[in-house]
Amino acid sequence: MTWKTQLPTARGKLLIDEALAPFTWFRVGGPADVVFLPADEQDLSDFLKGLDPSVPVMAIGVGSNLLVRDGGVDGVVIRLGKGFNGVEALGDNRIKAGSAVPDAILARKAAEAGIAGLEFYVGVPGTIGGAVIMNAGCYGAETVNVVKSVRVMNRAGVVRELSVEDLHYTYRHSALQDGEPVIVLDAIFEGTPDEPEAIKARMAEITARRETTQPIREKTGGSTFKNPPGHSSWKLVDEAGWRGKPYGGAMFSPLHSNFLINTGEATAADLEGLGEAVRADVLAKTGVQLDWEIKRIGRAG
């Protein structure tokens, strides 16, 4: 008898040996021992409190910035969905969003409420949970500029609230990536007042720019590498000759050379292998280290 046969009772869905590829934008990767789709915050807390504490746990959103290796993932992967996708305008230019809310939806809801400053989220793939954890941003704006507080749940199912100061934000990084793993439940953001139509016009400009410069309809994980100090990753990849160059079923997009894409039949090994080959080549040619922005999890196949 294993821990998988002794799972706590849950109101949400428990899926055993479930393929993770359909849960990610790359559409690759092996199975998780267990995928848990909690019904709501209480269901998640009760499950974690009843789960064997030795079992690894991690949470995902829509899998937009995630590469799951072909051998799959040990433990429980928690997919946050309907019970975590509420948005509520709080007044005083503040808005609260659940961790499963798509970034673009938060931008639209903020615009409808006349809250400016969150427009950039319309250009960020993924959900609020991931945005808060990695200080997501684009076109000169970042999460640190607008988030005020975050509620998280730890592995023991205990909830606490953190201020933006507690998060110690830097470029594409927060304190949530260090130390004890936690699950983001929701966050409160603050913008500035403006007319909804003016906000929506700025969002439309971001959307148009993104559609002409990024392969948003491909199987991609968004930006592959962080920008090194003083450099643009896309330019380093491009100048090293990797734009549009096939590597198994993987390629750096001809449209944007910092976007790794699955051209149809890629494995996770193709995608990660290409990324590592490019990192090594760029380092050899320029002396500049490229660091992954995409999160890679699981076992090699």
UniProtKB/Swiss-Prot annotation:
It comes from the Bacteria. It comes from Caulobacter vibrioides (strain NA1000 / CB15N) (Caulobacter crescentus). Its EC number is 1.3.1.98. The keyword Cytoplasm applies. It is an enzyme of class 1 (oxidoreductase). InterPro entries: FAD-bd_PCMH, FAD-bd_PCMH-like_sf, FAD-bd_PCMH_sub1, FAD-bd_PCMH_sub2, MurB, MurB_C, MurB_C_sf, Oxid_FAD_bind_N. Pathway: Cell wall biogenesis; peptidoglycan biosynthesis. GO terms for cellular component: cytosol. It catalyses: UDP-N-acetyl-alpha-D-muramate + NADP(+) = UDP-N-acetyl-3-O-(1-carboxyvinyl)-alpha-D-glucosamine + NADPH + H(+). GO terms for biological process: cell division; cell wall organization; peptidoglycan biosynthetic process; regulation of cell shape. Its main location: cytoplasm. This is UDP-N-acetylenolpyruvoylglucosamine reductase. It is found in: Cytoplasm. Transmembrane segments: none annotated. GO terms for molecular function: FAD binding; UDP-N-acetylmuramate dehydrogenase activity. Keywords: Cell cycle, Cell division, Cell shape, Cell wall biogenesis/degradation, Cytoplasm, FAD, Flavoprotein, NADP, Oxidoreductase, Peptidoglycan synthesis. The active site is at 172, 223 (proton donor), 293. PROSITE patterns: FAD_PCMH. Cell wall formation. Residues 27-194 form the FAD-binding PCMH-type domain. SUPFAM superfamilies: FAD-binding/transporter-associated domain-like, Uridine diphospho-N-Acetylenolpyruvylglucosamine reductase, MurB, C-terminal domain. Its cofactor is FAD. The gene is murB. Belongs to the MurB family.
